[in-house]
Amino acid sequence: MKPLFVLLLLLLLLDLAQAQGVLHRVPLRRHQSLRKKLRAQGQLSDFWRSHNLDMIEFSESCNVDKGINEPLINYLDMEYFGTVSIGSPSQNFTVIFDTGSSNLWVPSVYCTSPACKAHPVFHPSQSSTYMEVGNHFSIQYGTGSLTGIIGADQVSVEGLTVEGQQFGESVKEPGQTFVNAEFDGILGLGYPSLAVGGVTPVFDNMMAQNLVALPMFSVYLSSDPQGGSGSELTFGGYDPSHFSGSLNWIPVTKQGYWQIALDGIQVGDTVMFCSEGCQAIVDTGTSLITGPPKKIKQLQEAIGATPMDGEYAVDCATLNMMPNVTFLINGVSYTLSPTAYILPDLVDGMQFCGSGFQGLDIQPPAGPLWILGDVFIRKFYSVFDRGNNQVGLAPAVP
């Protein structure tokens, strides 16, 4: 028994060493989402119509092609944001750290769109380390394009400084989504194949410049509705204090998104979807859980959600009678209770309980795909391991 005990101890110590290395923690702040703002103002239905979105019958269609098409609704519910600094001296921006895309972009001083007037803008002339690249880029968001030019400068995230990082400077931002959003830009953490314009992503440069001890990062999203205290993105490893039990390592099936295989989706005791397997992505840049619209419509009916002012909601008094929804992944069950997948809000002094599921039509060849967004990640600590091309999941500690 003694050799076995020694072996187990060594494996435990190795795992802890790998986990902790030198961790660089990026605090994530939780703010009110754009959907909640629009709902409180009674403008949500108008928003759907102005963007030609049908959120009840089907939803937004997304024809993904190497990451140049991003579904608009992905960012409607975003609540967790961090800070990135660009240039010398630093110019600070609030960004979404998004595992579902691979570019860094922020508004440019040359942008004339209403969204840019409502947010900080990057001034290249004020940075002594800025380098002009000059290439143009374009990312499709829903019904409009975000366009701009690519520049290069030093980019800092909580003490990690990447030299010569190419990033997008937006000169045109579409629609109203970015006008009212809490974030200024997006920092993508997906694979290089998703990067628009062949730009090397920030995390790839962190690895290449030996800024992280281990080629991985991890995400913990607090369930605390008042500011999300403790939420963080960790570069260079993971923090075992944020989860219970051990990590279940799931192979990445396609390197672009952080894409994994689903073995099934169970509602209550019944496997309703993916009984023969399907594909999903773990995405910090999507707040809800999305899936093929017809499947999501069936799921909404199964949990008792009904259309209400352009979105699905349930009677808040029925939560204790609603079924659990379980995702079967790599032999492990990941169960969300109704309190996890129903999102409460207060509208005109009345309690509103919205569904955490949303239809999203991701067309071939990238789709169909399910997206496990923040509703899922809040309950399951997520580790993104580039060294072994795998995702680690474990129950998050509240």
Swiss-Prot record:
Post-translational events: Glycosylated. The nature of the carbohydrate chain varies between cell types. In brain microglia, the proenzyme contains a high mannose-type oligosaccharide, while the mature enzyme contains a complex-type oligosaccharide. In stomach and spleen, the mature enzyme contains a high mannose-type oligosaccharide. In erythrocyte membranes, the mature enzyme contains a complex-type oligosaccharide.
Entry's Gene Ontology BP terms: antigen processing and presentation of exogenous peptide antigen via MHC class II; protein autoprocessing; proteolysis
Example GO molecular function: peptidase activity
Tissues where the protein occurs: Expressed abundantly in lymphocytes and macrophages of the thymus and spleen, and in the M cells of the intestine. In the brain, expression is limited to reactive microglial cells, the large pyrimidial neurons in the cerebral cortex, the CA1 and CA3 pyrimidial neurons of the hippocampus, the large neurons of the neostriatum, and the Purkinje neurons of the cerebellum.
Annotated GO CC locations: endosome
Residues with attached carbohydrate: N92
UniProt-annotated catalytic positions: D98, D283
Disulfide bonds: C111-C116, C274-C278
Catalytic activity, reaction form: Similar to cathepsin D, but slightly broader specificity
Propeptide stretch(es), residue numbers: 22-58
Keyword terms: Aspartyl protease, Autocatalytic cleavage, Disulfide bond, Endosome, Glycoprotein, Hydrolase, Protease, Signal, Zymogen
Signal peptide: 1-21
EC category name: hydrolase
Location relative to the cell: Endosome
Positions in coiled-coil regions: none
UniProt main location, coarse: other
Start and end residues of each Peptidase A1 domain: 80-394
Known partners and oligomeric status: Homodimer; disulfide-linked.
UniProt cross-references to PANTHER family, sorted A to Z: BETA-SITE APP-CLEAVING ENZYME, ISOFORM A-RELATED (PTHR47966), CATHEPSIN E (PTHR47966:SF26)
Name of the featured protein: Cathepsin E
